[in-house]
Regions:
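Multi-pass alpha-helical transmembrane bundle typical of ion/small-solute transporters
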Residues: 2-349
Length: 349
């Protein structure tokens, strides 16, 4: 949909709820930057390759680049987001239901950020949108074939992240058996810096498409079309969302870095490289195949796999358990909030 910013403002004047949806998209995107984007740089900080302030600045820049850049490479994730729910029906009711879904995701994200829980904004968004769609159209509001990609993504990121983290550690240890430790650590520092850039790029690519998809869904609904054009996004929307995710990263980064990179398992530099390789591969594959996944989910699984490669006792399973609990709670919590708020809002449609 070729939509200029002037066209958007004109449409929002006719449908004020559309402007509210854009504000909510910006809010959710910023919360994602605060709670999920720091996962991309957790290992590079925990292994002391970069200072937290430098790493957070790097993440902010390349989240911006990734969000804009991936739009020109692949929009597979956006197509999944567009296709997994059905908001067809009364235009005003659909827009109100979409607003409720966004508010549910924001409330849950703020709760998790306040308590230092690295929850997934991806899962929050998907759950909230699903709850809103069900409130609007019942179970017919969910498209099982597309929604299944969410389940595939969760399973893939957990299994692939853990296994590849374990595997890459073994490969690196074998390859560096006779390498001078000081020289190896110097090389691993540089590699981790590159990985931090790649992971920040991929986080922006994954989450950017999810959030921009909701904004474009709102635009499409305001025109009476339940299915947006997934071939691209207007530049003004990409710039707004990329700035939001970068600002969120700068504001909220340190709290999540501590939970993921420092408290769960103590990493050496080569182990940080292994975790980053694992997360990079997992995110890239998911982005190209249209599976919406969480950077935090992928990174946490990779770190646990790396820690388990030495000994299962090296992993702080209490931290890991709390994270898994947060993931498990996100779908029913955000889904229910989105569902209830949608019913409440639609009373005024």
């Amino acid at each position: 949909m070729a939509l200029s910013f002037v066209d958007f403002i004109s449409q929002a004047m006719a449908q004020p709820s559309l402007f509210v949806i854009l504000i909510l998209v910006i809010g959710v995107t910023a919360v994602s930057g605060a709670t999920d984007a720091p996962n991309a740089i957790a290992t590079v900080v925990s292994t002391r390759c970069l200072k937290p302030s430098v790493a957070i600045g790097l993440a902010a820049v390349f989240n911006f680049v990734g969000l804009v850049g991936m739009t020109y490479i692949s929009t597979a994730v956006a197509k999944t987001m567009f296709g997994m729910v059905d908001f067809s029906g009364n235009t005003d009711a659909a827009l109100y239901a979409l607003m409720a879904a966004m508010i549910g995701a924001i409330l849950w994200g703020i709760f998790c950020w306040f308590f230092g829980i690295p929850c997934s904004k991806s899962h929050s968004l998907i759950a909230g949108v699903t709850g809103g769609a069900i409130a609007l159209n019942g179970l017919a509001g969910v498209v099982p074939a597309e929604w299944a990609k969410v389940i595939y993504g969760m399973a893939f990121s957990l299994v692939a992240g853990f296994f590849l983290g374990w595997l890459f550690v073994k490969v690196i240890e074998k390859a560096c058996t006779h390498v001078n430790r000081q020289a190896a650590n110097h090389a691993f520092t540089g590699i981790q810096d590159v990985c931090a850039v790649a992971l920040s790029f991929l986080h922006g690519a994954q989450d950017g498409q999810k959030f921009m998809s909701i904004a474009m869904l709102g635009v499409a609904l305001s025109f009476g079309n339940p299915t947006p054009d997934s071939n691209g996004f207007p530049m003004w929307l990409m710039i707004i969302c990329s700035l939001a995710i970068s600002l969120g990263t700068i504001v909220g980064g340190k709290r999540i870095i501590k939970s993921v990179g420092m408290d769960m398992v103590k990493l050496e530099k080569y182990q940080g490289v292994a975790a980053n390789f694992s997360t990079t591969f997992t995110l890239l594959f998911a982005s190209l195949t249209g599976m919406p996944v969480s950077t935090g989910h992928c990174n946490t699984s990779a770190i646990m796999g790396v820690g388990a490669s030495k000994s299962f006792k090296r992993v702080n399973w209490g931290i890991a358990r709390n994270m898994v609990l947060a993931w498990v709670l996100t779908f029913p919590a955000c889904g229910l909030i989105g569902f209830l708020l949608a019913h409440l809002f639609m009373m005024f449609a």
